[in-house]
Amino acid sequence: MASTDEPGVGSGDPTARARQAEAIVNHAEHSISEDAIVAAARERAVDIGAGAVSPAVGALLCVLAKLTGARAVVEVGTGAGVSGLWLLSGMREDGVLTTIDVEPEHQRIAKQAFSEAGVGPGRTRLISGRAQEVLTRLADESYDLVFIDAAPADQPHFVTEGVRLLRPGGAIVVHRAALGGRAGDATAKDSEVAAVREAARLIAEDDRLTPVLIPLGDGLLAAARD
């Protein structure tokens, strides 16, 4: 049968497919505009070295919060509040974001961002402490969405706890699931890669979860719970 693929598109040329995939991701990453409040929070994140999700990742978090009808969300890694602002924008008006960070200064700056956005104090619960300890104190099946943006080495523990927290119909999202492509490199054997792969395995082997790996930011591993 004659192929209808255009030159360099589809299943023909692996190099062309790779270029096309890169162009699509680049387009997606630059297709989202942020308002002045989120942009200011992003600048503060740079100033304090906190890191922040890309606008495209933020927009996806907003969409997932809307799709799950999220009233209760847990975020591991407050940073300067960029991802929190995106999550809050998609949550229900009576929703509460619980956000955890070991750095009190990060949370102080995030609180400023939330205030600038007009987010009432009753809609956020900022917990300063080690997420490894804080998560264990949160109630089972009490959250609609769990977002993990933390050190790759801690992903397996956070995934285990995050899935425990999810209500049926909820979703878990893990950022930094690709490690710049290293997670998919069969020759990469370092401890970070091993931890990220273990987190992915835990999600893949849980029959209650339907996972997908999304090529935005540094890779998002998302899963919906039945």
UniProtKB/Swiss-Prot annotation:
S-adenosyl-L-methionine binds at residues 53, 75, 77-78, 83, 101-102. CDD domains: AdoMet_MTases. GO terms for molecular function: O-methyltransferase activity; S-adenosylmethionine-dependent methyltransferase activity. Substrate binds at residue 149. Its EC number is 2.1.1.-. It is an enzyme of class 2 (transferase). Keywords: Methyltransferase, S-adenosyl-L-methionine, Transferase. It holds the Pfam family Methyltransf_3. PROSITE patterns: SAM_OMT_I (PS51682). One of its GO terms (biological process) is methylation. Belongs to the class I-like SAM-binding methyltransferase superfamily. Cation-dependent O-methyltransferase family. PANTHER family: O-METHYLTRANSFERASE RV1220C-RELATED (PTHR10509:SF85), O-METHYLTRANSFERASE-RELATED (PTHR10509). This is Putative O-methyltransferase Mvan_4497.
